């Protein structure tokens, strides 16, 4: 008799994805982030569902409903802070996951990579709309500033902004629709994750050497299930310490002040995980130019398979490219810091230089370096 996990129509899908999946024998801890992201997504959906049971999407009661969750609901504070800090963990893992993809040349699986880029945009949209829901000062002004960027689109811009707002400013209609979208988008993300995995399992996983590993594969279970559980353990320890010891470490204090349309905060800034893109947006004096740069700062990832000039897939054996990638990481950290600073000298200049170097490294210097490395290896 055939084993049920290999014959049952539903269980065999799980079996081919998580149990008998042939996996390269040499993938490192950098390949743990996929499962960690899946766990984060599940955690966000569960905590979000419980928060939605107590939250009211109305401008008059939204702020006090969040206060009510923290003060009166059993373990409400824990659910709220798990959801808020879980989002930060989600983005940390996302950036590590993308970084690993760039380092080891995983972007050559174009379908998987492009679905991943669309996923990144969707997750960013979800996080932005979630940040608006507590209806604090930064929620309100963040929503006003970011949605207002769409007015830079020629001809249809101003109409589009009012259409998104549901009126002539960010108000009750905006909050209600943002809550609706914030609730539904994670389920769309889950569906897209399944497509992401479907494309990945068509080709099989990449590995640190960047060489085809069909001759050296091992079953996913028990080897990588154990490895993933260890990663999850580290994640939960870190997240628990963050929630229980310093839950507001990554939160803007301005968001503990109820939204007031008549009082603008001194520095409007998004959550830390959007600061690098925000710095790129601010570094261009022209509104439309800034919006294009903002979108392209993420969309540039789609170009990576096209501008890959190296004869090798991975950066494991390309020291110059490695060095450049770490310069890019440092550059992104500088952009993140600049995004949190006021718009004044010297931050404007630093932001502009960091923005230029960000695009130059990816579009010009990295492909040129890869080409040079080919010549050095007489390829």
Swiss-Prot record:
Its membrane topology: Multi-pass membrane protein
Chain sites annotated for binding heme b b562: 83, 182
Cellular location(s): Mitochondrion inner membrane
Cofactor binding: number and manner: Binds 2 heme b groups non-covalently.
Superkingdom in the source lineage: Eukaryota
Pfam families: Cytochrom_B_C, Cytochrome_B
Binding site for heme b b566: 97, 196
Protein function: Component of the ubiquinol-cytochrome c reductase complex (complex III or cytochrome b-c1 complex) that is part of the mitochondrial respiratory chain. The b-c1 complex mediates electron transfer from ubiquinol to cytochrome c. Contributes to the generation of a proton gradient across the mitochondrial membrane that is then used for ATP synthesis.
Assembly notes: The cytochrome bc1 complex contains 11 subunits: 3 respiratory subunits (MT-CYB, CYC1 and UQCRFS1), 2 core proteins (UQCRC1 and UQCRC2) and 6 low-molecular weight proteins (UQCRH/QCR6, UQCRB/QCR7, UQCRQ/QCR8, UQCR10/QCR9, UQCR11/QCR10 and a cleavage product of UQCRFS1). This cytochrome bc1 complex then forms a dimer.
UniProt miscellaneous comment: Heme 1 (or BL or b562) is low-potential and absorbs at about 562 nm, and heme 2 (or BH or b566) is high-potential and absorbs at about 566 nm.
Family: Belongs to the cytochrome b family.
Protein name from the UniProt record: Cytochrome b
Lineage, broadest ranks: Eukaryota, Metazoa, Chordata, Craniata, Vertebrata
Gene it is expressed from: MT-CYB
